[in-house]
């Protein structure tokens, strides 16, 4: 390397310093000043990591004064260059610009500039960049985008609802699946799709206070969506950042109580302009035409201001038609304006539902059913279908006609677009619950303390006394002190120890109401029998709970027993276990259902054993009998439980408080009767049409199968590992489909997106991720992959490379130039552009004569024949063929233009076809189904106009290039 004062060089390792100038030289070192970043660097002359900057005829260079020069001649004097040419702004010719006056800000961003400046990348980085572009393009185009990356089982009805709703603009729907069918996951999938496609950027989730953590965990674990819980303390903290604390975060989670209690916070939340509002447990919003509750008014105001609204409820409408109407009113007040009109309209659907049931079972349609269908659908549409059903056509034709009738009825179904409800009855695949009620003798220690407590408890309300009597171990501790070891004599603990020893190979989940009970049970198992158990309660942080859950999930060396408190277990699922022990009983049937729901969920592969050890002659025994004989709540899901409880609570509570009573038998008998009546009402009122629409039938199966195919994508594994390598992450194989990825010292960036500071355990396998909550499930949609690709692009990794092709059939020194162009439409993300015209790579392979060989020579097989070149040799090769490379770049533009036009045209066709058919369907439906909102049609119309413009304006640019030189050895 020969240096001279005033020469301009660029740093190979710190390209962001800008253009450097040689300011000092001695025998061993050279000093460069980088004026743009105000930095100096001293290098050893013999191997300084810098590259000489020399421009060529035809280049446009910037001066420090801000004007540009088109270079026509380059003159050298004692190692320093002067550029002669024409000024671009004044068109003055013969202007000289000495290199010392070149702009300090010159950056070599264009791939060809970097190539000529000697900033040549590794060959494998060029390959990685091209693969990143092609994979990203395929992901954006996939109709399943937003559904593949979540950590959840592929359950058809959930995927169908998410696919159906997630693609809508500002969806407003009511998700009313029964308990255990995964409404939270459906909502999460919808949110995930809306976020990925840019349709929703600001999201507010409002839930009951006890469910805040569950939602936080589910969104983070399953969808990599990081919400912030907002309470009064958080709002006060955020006040320093913004006047409105809700504007400091994009994704906010808060409790309904918090918004109800503070008018100021409620008004701030209203002003914060959300794109999507999600409300869980929406059945708690009470409404009467004259007097809506404060909670209802809070949500109503938010729903009016927010374009997208998802309401979640587990209560079927048959158990409260008025409150069902109130929920629909929140979604579309113009459509559901009057309760009486709504009831009338609902009544019209009853015969339709009957007709559909008949169609489904393949029975012959009655004349009444036919008339009803003809009233709803026009005669010319249905007549040929009726004929087909009654003719001697083939089974396939009859099935087709039947399906078409059902589809048409579904589209016309009043609430089909706003309401989704799946029931266990309509969805197969649930386990059987084997119930074991185990009456155990009450220890004398408890009898004494409970008798004394009964005498002292005069001031307590019956409800408080009833609650107290359910937990004799707590009463005993009140008298004997916190440290008293009740677990040494409690017969339930003795039974539990025997059961755990007898079921050594099984994982056992134990649920107790209180955190203190759970902790003491763990101590009992450990101290009395040395059994490995772990605890899960509300006093633990999310990370501690994750660790406990992972310890329980581990096949080898894990805990055999997990002991949960009531609140601690909310929202966690342990489908890999099928043994459930209820150490005590909760007061209300919903909580009981929630407990069993930890194991009895869709996706549970085995039947479940539910053990209920209870002490005789206590309130527990009464409650166990009422749950079992009055509600049958242990053996079956009990959607009616709450309604029956509300009807009998006043009579049942005093009996629980007293530990018995004459009226108990009557209450049990009457409860069973009411339960039966309510259940049959539910069955009669089952809306088959709605159920079919909600579970998606065949279509749902296809979606699940399509996603399952992408799950085993080895291409993703290879790509992700190369990506982590290129960025400098440390990887360690942990077996069991797991890898540990940690930040390393020499990373390209200080912190890697989506990767915690301490690193993470990752897996590419969905089943492993489902059983191990401490692992990240890596998919194309995961922030670590998406963020890594963004890093490659923004840091300019792999934009130029040089490779050797060892091929004796070609003369030595033959050159080929591989160029990757990208077509990109500058448009806001929320316009939906990425569905039709994502960043699209075009590969061109020019031979020395300027012919494009890309259609004959496929990228991967060609790449396997190439070998890398060290940087020094690469720079020499580039210098020797610089003129040819310039020529080939110009020639490649002629080759790329027709392909760009073809991409634009195809994108226009796809967009018009997809959105116009959607628009036509909505317009046709609007004529017969008042549930189609005008706003939805207007937005779609506007979207078509905007996208037409954006696609027409799409530009192309050179993203990366590789020079290939033929060698023989």
UniProtKB/Swiss-Prot annotation:
It comes from the Bacteria. The keyword Transcription regulation applies. GO terms for biological process: DNA repair; regulation of DNA-templated transcription. Its EC number is 3.6.4.-. Residues 164-334 form the Helicase ATP-binding domain. GO terms for molecular function: ATP binding; DNA binding; helicase activity; hydrolase activity, acting on acid anhydrides. ATP binds at residues 177-184. Pfam families: Helicase_C (PF00271), RapA_C (PF12137), SNF2-rel_dom (PF00176), Tudor_1_RapA (PF18339), Tudor_RapA (PF18337). Keywords: Activator, ATP-binding, DNA-binding, Helicase, Hydrolase, Nucleotide-binding, Transcription, Transcription regulation. Gene3D superfamilies: 2.30.30.140, 2.30.30.930, 3.30.360.80, 6.10.140.1500, 6.10.140.2230, P-loop containing nucleotide triphosphate hydrolases, Tandem AAA-ATPase domain. A motif (DEAH box) lies at residues 280-283. Residues 492-646 form the Helicase C-terminal domain. PROSITE patterns: HELICASE_ATP_BIND_1 (PS51192), HELICASE_CTER (PS51194). Interacts with the RNAP. Has a higher affinity for the core RNAP than for the holoenzyme. Its ATPase activity is stimulated by binding to RNAP. Transcription regulator that activates transcription by stimulating RNA polymerase (RNAP) recycling in case of stress conditions such as supercoiled DNA or high salt concentrations. Probably acts by releasing the RNAP, when it is trapped or immobilized on tightly supercoiled DNA. Does not activate transcription on linear DNA. Probably not involved in DNA repair. This is RNA polymerase-associated protein RapA.
